[in-house]
Amino acid sequence: MWRQAKWNEPLIFELNKSGAARQGFLINKDEEIRSQIKEMKIPKNLLRENEPDLPSLSELEVVRHFVRLSQMNFGVDIGIMPLGSCTMKYNPKIEEKATAITEFHHPLEDEDYIQGILEMIYELQNWFSEITGMDECSLQVPAGSAGEFAGVLMIKKYHEEHNRNYKDTILVADTAHGTNPASAAMAGYKVMYVKSNAEGLVDMDILREIVNDKTAGFMLTNPNTLGLFEENILEISKIIHSTNAVLYYDGANLNGVLGIARPGDMGFDIVHLNLHKTFAVPHGGGGPGAGAICAKGELVNYLPYPMVEKVNGKYKLSKIPKNSIGKIATFYGNVGNLARSFAYILGLGPQGIQMIGKMSTLATNYLIAKLRDVKELELIAPNRHRKHEVVFSVKQLMENYGVSANDVAKALLDNGFYAPTIYFPPIVEEALMIEPTETETKETLDMFAETLKKIVNDAKINPEQVMKSPNNTSIARLDQAYANHPSTITPTYRVLRLRRLGKIDYLK
């Protein structure tokens, strides 16, 4: 039986309760250096009034603290993480070496001394353009979501340049990721949802009905969030372009068609990529991520700058598209993560890239085949082929036994599996969204499927047991309201300290 470690581990600031002065290393007070720099004259306005509130700990204490925390955590190095629409694939460790060459990463480094880094970015621009079927690509954006926002800003400026300010609405699918309507709203657009039909695809009749002169663009994933390929994509492209609107590709689900189908060939005009999903940038912990925004035709003129170009054999960070929306962030993206993606693509090559799309699709459909006889795991359009992910509904378990999707997810935790995404997309009741990715073995998928079958059976025989899960994890069920309420949410040690001192009530 799987059991997670459970340590009564305090915060690192609370480890040294004795107040003893401890150090992980000693600073060498070199007299020769001191004699050369003399007295350091730091302006008073830059000096701290008090010493920094840092924990005084030995190296051993720090190592043990974080190792114990890691034992109470879960990651892809421990087991499968089937979080749907997150593509929690295993990232080869060799990519870490690529990003470890930190001396060439400083954003103010002279171009003459970072030709290798600029060449890498230049090649990535071309590779991502080829992979997506776009004409050009900018890597200036610091994350996938920032790339998405940049794409909507490009749509907005494109219409403004063509005196089409009356286009005030962005369409999004009802299975869309939440960042789609958020990006559109942040750019000042109204948002209108396009409903899915009974087969889980864009309802073409509804689309034809709502597209009009005010439509600025349509944000769509393909495959969609149900794991289904939008088979009418070429017709969708014609409908959107008939009103001079822009077809925007959310790259969140690219893994399922990588190397097999390209957004540009489907009729999309702008593509954003999540390098943390598809191209070996690690997930979790709040970042940093990395993004790419690609475009074709006239829309390349609106890409964020700067872009790398090759001039007389020298790589320069000097390309500024004619109608660029400008910079999305300071300096140039997250270069360390771009190095990870560069090493990943270079190691795989075109054939390896294509195998990602094939194997991720195979893994999903194999899992469906293993679970097809479990009638409590319902599918929209059950006979349709899936791509990168699948969404099951456990509505029957909820209606007949009171066991929810959340309960099933917690029971998976009890068996040493990370939980799938739940209650998304919202068009599926009691949804379990599972994305196995291409890196999981048949044996792992078999174990996952058998465990899910067992949980469904347990839910029918002893539902109370499932509803009490998890029992084998470091922490059981959190009080979500308490954890997120402004009067109790405590994201940092400083907030905790202020709460204890009674100096803060609501976190704004």
Swiss-Prot record:
InterPro entries: GcvPB, GDC-P_C, GDC-P_N, GDC_P, PyrdxlP-dep_Trfase, PyrdxlP-dep_Trfase_major, PyrdxlP-dep_Trfase_small
GO-annotated cellular components: cytosol; glycine cleavage complex
Enzyme class: oxidoreductase
Molecular-function GO terms, alphabetical: glycine binding; glycine dehydrogenase (decarboxylating) activity; pyridoxal phosphate binding
Annotated keywords: Oxidoreductase, Pyridoxal phosphate
Single GO BP term: glycine decarboxylation via glycine cleavage system
Signal peptide residues on this chain, from the entry's feature table: none
Cofactor: pyridoxal 5'-phosphate
rRNA processing as UniProt keyword: no
Catalytic activity as recorded in UniProt: N(6)-[(R)-lipoyl]-L-lysyl-[glycine-cleavage complex H protein] + glycine + H(+) = N(6)-[(R)-S(8)-aminomethyldihydrolipoyl]-L-lysyl-[glycine-cleavage complex H protein] + CO2
Xref: Gene3D superfamilies: 6.20.440.10, Aspartate Aminotransferase, domain 1, Type I PLP-dependent aspartate aminotransferase-like (Major domain)
Annotated positions of the N6-(pyridoxal phosphate)lysine modification: K277
EC number(s) from the headed UniProt entry: 1.4.4.2
Listed HAMAP family: GcvPB
Function: The glycine cleavage system catalyzes the degradation of glycine. The P protein binds the alpha-amino group of glycine through its pyridoxal phosphate cofactor; CO(2) is released and the remaining methylamine moiety is then transferred to the lipoamide cofactor of the H protein.
NCBIfam families given in the database record: PRK04366.1
Record family assignment: Belongs to the GcvP family. C-terminal subunit subfamily.
Subunit text: The glycine cleavage system is composed of four proteins: P, T, L and H. In this organism, the P 'protein' is a heterodimer of two subunits.
UniProt protein name: Probable glycine dehydrogenase (decarboxylating) subunit 2
Originating gene: gcvPB
